[in-house]
Amino acid sequence: MNAVEYQQAARRRTASERRRDLSHPDLARPDLVRPDLAVLADRPAAWVAHVPPIEEPAARRTGTGAPDMPLSKLAAAGQGEIGEPGVGEQGRSSAADGLRLLLARAHSLSAMLGESCAPSIHSLRATTERVAALARAGEFEELTSALGRLLPGLEAAVRTVPKESQADAYELTAMAYQACSAALMKLGEPLAAWVAADRAMAAAEQAGNLLLAAAGQYRLAAVFLDSGEYALADEIARTSLIALRGLAELGDPDALSLRGGLTLLRATVAARTDHPATAFGHLATARLIASRLAGRTANELPEFGAQYVALVEIAVSVDLGDADHALRAAAAVDTASMPAGRLARMLVDVARAYALRQEVDQATAALARAVDLEPAEARDGAFALIGELASMRTPPPRLLVALAAQVGALPP
């Protein structure tokens, strides 16, 4: 059973059950920020205009908070000719522009006017699976092209398919917009990612799929986290955990996975707002959830397990300024079977830990290995840290300057 089929098999919750979930006193408090209530109230996607502009992708913030050294100083050190400018930045920017344009197009209006044709559910399911895989792999140009073909068909399908297939069409729509949101966050486009996450939650609600709606909540919380809106991220995660409690207590693997991911997100928020006891408390809770999940497979977002808890512990320790704990935690992780992208993200955090100790050579070596393993996953983290490392030593090491050129951190 693939991810789409599992989600569809798990979806059926009656309208009264959904109303009961939403009637929890914590969910009904008027003072809480509740983006899902905006969906239920049928508020337009233009509500994102109330978010303050983000000046810099959060993925590019450094671990220590020190300002980046002007990258022109790297070139002035006599090393500016080493290597070629980073090859990925232009492609990533064009992909971001493409995804933003897709969200701006009036697919739903065209479908309402009968100007779009709906492919079969089987065809839509296959394309949605491919879109989800492209988003996970970071193949943003292909993802943009695939979504450009998929979204008009999905918007037409939810309006034209027989009633018995409507829930399937809405679920596929939710999954497609979730993939779009995840990609936009990786590309440093938080406001567009918010729009996509909002549409994903609206579609999941129409489908009656609690788990898919919760996955949309997780995606929205991640948008706020990466945008530095920590109070909003934590509130979404906290109230989503309340809603998922019943299913998780029954041992549903998807509910456990979502609770684990949301708990790790709260740990990250606590670390970035300088609450170490709270952060490590959430990590302890996440370990318990991972032990309950054990080896069972969960198909919902996010991926979760004991290894993810260990990786977040490293990042949390760096965010709290505890480089020694971060490096001890990293040394205890079994990386033998770890996917390249995940290992690259861990190595960026290891480099951040070494930077806290001002160990430039070790940090540079970790960054270089991360970029070699998975350039798309490591580039932003490396870009953010290079200037900080360069400011620690004059002139900067040759390997660091070469790495700067590789990731596009030198002026052309």
Predicted features, each with a name:
Residues M1-L102, E359-P412:
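C-terminal non-catalytic interaction modules
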